[in-house]
Structure formats: structure tokens, C-alpha cells
Amino acid sequence: YLLVTAHYDHLGKTALGIYHGANDNGSGTVSVIEIARALGALKPHPRRTIVFITLFGEEEGLLGSYYYAHHPLFPLKDTIVDINLEQMGRTDDPAGKKAGEFTVTGPSYSNVASILGEAAKAEDIGVYTRKDADDYFDRSDNYSFAQFGVISHTVVVAVDFPDYHGLGDNWEKIDFANMAKVDRGVAAGILRLANDADAPVWSNAPGAAIYRNAGR
């Protein structure tokens, strides 16, 4: 099995106003739906079953993914990877515009980033690496599955987009054309993971040891 996940909750409403969460994480939720629609229409079906899940409570402490990890519909011992989608719609980042590319959290922890990147080339999508990418590994729902030994990573377009957890995270700022293109690249990577004879593997990076040795 493969998991493809995204959280659909956000911060809600406060005295300051409504936090719409269009990019974080409406965009990730839409990406899960669209990738599921595209891959679900393929004939023949992929070699491995792909399970698409939208999760609640990420902003409250990864609650939805924590629950699924403890009550899986399909055995985690038979789950080879989780690809978690976050902030797929905005390209504006203080480090420069992130059009036509995405990054993967914890890239040194497994060979998943290289698999996704190689497959995404067919859609003219690149993968960029942040120096602090490993530091973001435990910041989203992938972390719940990694604690059970499932290779899990979060895919992000613009990590530090303006309006993060702000009132200005509105749909008008989403780059829909780029989002569709990146989704196609990510879908190509997911399909490769689903069809490859070899499952992805944890690396020997020191930071991966705790997950590599986690009990299933």
C-alpha cells in the first residue's frame, strides 16, 4: 500500500477574522483529490493499492494522522510510503519564486525524494533542496507514520510563503496553473512508487535512525 495524505483543517475563526487556509492546506487537499481522480482512472491499475486520505486536526497536533497510524484501515507493516501534500498552491517565497518545482521534507532520510524528482522530470518539474529541509520532517502529518517505521515525507512548493497562518491566505493568491503542473509531477512520482518492484528504503543518515528502527 501507498498513502497519499493532506490535512484539510486550518485555524478557523478568531476575533481578528476568518483564517481561510487556501494554501495551508486547501491546496494540499485539492491536490489529493485531483491526483486520486487521475490515477484512479488509469487502466491497468497500479501494481500497489494507493490509499488517499484527507486528515483533520493537523494544526492541533497531527491528530488525524495520529489516529490513522494507531487505527489503520490497511496494515502499516504492508504500507511502503506516505506522500503528504502541503502548501501546493503558492509560489511566492522569500527565497525566490518556486514555480515548476517542489521540495521534500527530510530528503536525506530515504530515497523517496530522488524517486519523486526523477519521475517529475517527465512533467518538467524539478525538486529543490533546502539546507534546513530535515528540520521540517516532524512538522506535518508524515511524522505520525514515520514513528511507526513507514517511510513518510511531505511535499511542499513554497515553504515560507507570505500569509502562513495569516488572514491573507486566500484563494486569489493561488497559482492554479503551476499547482496543476506540480500535481502532475507528483502524481508521476506516486505512480512510479506504486509500480516499482523495489519499495523505497530508509537511508543511513543519523536523523533517519529512529524511524528506520521504529517498530511496525
Which residues fall in each region the model found?
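Short acidic, glycine/proline-rich loop/turn micro-motifs
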Residues: T14-Y19, P94-K97, H165-D169
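Metal-dependent peptidase/peptidase-like ectodomains
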Residues: L55-T154, A158-D160
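Alpha-helical metal-binding/catalytic segments enriched in His/Glu/Asp
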Residues: V4-G61, V186
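C-terminal soluble interaction/assembly domains
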Residues: S31, A36, G40-H45, L62, ...
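His/Asp/Glu-rich mid-to-C-terminal helical/loop segments that flank catalytic regions of hydrolases
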Residues: R37, A41, P162-R216
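Surface-exposed patches in mature extracellular/periplasmic domains of secreted proteins
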Residues: R48, G126-D135, A197-A205
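Extracytoplasmic/secreted envelope proteins and their assembly/folding machinery
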Residues: T29, I33-A36, L62-A69, A113, ...
